[in-house]
Every structure is written in C-alpha cells, then in structure tokens.
Amino acid sequence: MPVAKPLDLPFDPIERAAEIWGDRFGPADAMAAVTSIMRAQQILLGGLDGLLRPYGLTFARYEALVLLAFSRRGTLPLRVIGERLMVHPTSVTNTVDRLERDGLVRRRPNPRDGRGTLAEITPSGRDVVTRSTADLMAARFGMAGYDPPELGEIFTLLRGLRVSAGDFTPEPGAAAVSAPVTPPSAIRRRR
C-alpha cells in the first residue's frame, strides 16, 4: 500500500517529545498516545487515498459510496449520509458534488420530504465500489502488520473513546469499553 512520505528519522519523534514533555509538564502517556493516533491517522489516510486515487476517489468519497451501496435501495438522504459518516453537512454536499460530477451518484428529490435530496449510487458507482474495495481488502486497509486479535484490540480501545465522546450508546451486553476520556465539550468549557 502506498504510504505517506516516510520521515526516515533516526529516532522516534513522538517518544522524544514524550521524554521532553515528562521533564517539563509531567506524565506524557496521554500526549504520546494521542500524538501517535494522530500520526497513524495521517499515515493510514495517505495510504488509503493513494490506493483509491486510480478510481478518482478519496477515502471520504469511498465511504459515502459504500454507505450508498449498503443501503437497501442504493439511496440515502444527504442528511443521513452526514449522520452516518459523522461529518458536517457542507462536507456531505462537497463529497456528493464530486461523486455526481464523476457519474458515481446522482441526486434526486426525496419523495418523502419535499425539501430533502437523495443521493443515489449509479451502476458506475457500484462498479467502482466493487473494484476499489477489492484493492483495499488486498491491502488490509493499511493494517497488514496486525493480526486479527490485535485489530480487535485496537477496535475495542478506540471504541471506548468513541463511546465516551458520545458517538453512540452501546447496546447492553456489548464488548467492554476502555477507560473514559474527557469529552470535547468539557475540554472547551475549561478554556
């Protein structure tokens, strides 16, 4: 899988930052974890976007297409796409604009809501989803260095963060959630 441009440093900059942080501010475990997650996101997104580039997609556009492909009728209101992908309505509009321009989706009026708009995946869009997904699966979504139990651990740890942030309420009996994090709203109030 293509990856972000390697930094090729002779040391781990996050580990070094954690050492300095510890000397100046105190415990660095949370800072090092968050910085590692942010860097991992950059690496993964760069690699995934590189795999999807031959299809004229970014990972954000791919997610929207897959969401439409998953829907029973191949259509969803733009509002629902935004909710499911957890993005701002403007981002959904821009994503659908590009997909429509490329002939992968089309807009049509929502018959249940006279003001709303549906995005509908086209046959070309379904074909692109099938082919691009095969490439992502072959690359294991950039996570080929991890075995299934490790991927499960990563999912569970990050799921706890998402639950604590209020992304969703887990169903009773769902997998255990890791330690809670400070929700973004509480961080904003402290400033």
Which residues does each predicted region cover?
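Amphipathic alpha-helices that form helix-helix packing interfaces
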Residues: 40, 44, 132, 154-157, ...
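Short, flexible, glycine-rich and Lys/Arg-enriched loop motifs at helix boundaries
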Residues: 15-26, 71-74, 138-144
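N-terminal helix-turn-helix DNA-binding core of bacterial DNA-binding proteins
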Residues: 28, 38, 42, 46-88, ...
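C-terminal regulatory/oligomerization modules of transcriptional regulators
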Residues: 1-25, 149-191
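Charged, amphipathic alpha-helical coiled-coil/dimerization segments
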Residues: 97-156
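Short amphipathic alpha-helical segments with heptad-repeat character
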Residues: 34, 38, 42, 86, ...
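N-terminal leader segment of winged-helix/HTH proteins
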Residues: 1-55
